Swiss-Prot record:
Gene3D superfamilies recorded: Nucleic acid-binding proteins
GO biological process terms on file: translation
Assembly information from the UniProt record: Part of the 30S ribosomal subunit.
Record-stated family: Belongs to the universal ribosomal protein uS17 family.
CDD domains: Ribosomal_uS17 (cd00364)
Record keywords: Ribonucleoprotein, Ribosomal protein, RNA-binding, rRNA-binding
Role summary: One of the primary rRNA binding proteins, it binds specifically to the 5'-end of 16S ribosomal RNA.
Taxonomy, superkingdom: Bacteria
Protein name in the entry: Small ribosomal subunit protein uS17
Length: 88
């Protein structure tokens, strides 16, 4: 019996917290059209992602993928850091 290949969900967002060990909080922003007025509104979602080597810092632009549940609220994993935050 052949199993269907499952597509891997990937998202891109900004790191807003790196205070936890091996975990980052990523803010995902998307634009949604308002059903009545037609204006595009920003909507956002915060996701916890696994960062095995603690390489991410606040402000980094990262790519994450869905994975099996790793904790109560963590079911995403870091794929790569797309852009480093500018240090002041």
């Amino acid at each position: 019996m052949a199993e269907a290949e499952k597509t891997v969900r990937t998202l891109t967002g900004r790191v807003v917290s790196d205070k936890m060990d091996k975990t980052i909080t990523v803010l995902i922003e998307r634009r949604v059209k308002h059903p009545i007025y037609g204006k595009y509104v920003k909507r956002s979602t915060k996701l916890h992602a696994h960062d095995e080597s603690n390489q991410c810092k606040i402000g980094d632009k990262v790519s994450i993928r869905e994975t099996r549940p790793l904790a109560k609220t963590k079911s995403w994993a870091l794929v790569e850091v797309l852009e480093r935050a500018v240090e002041v």
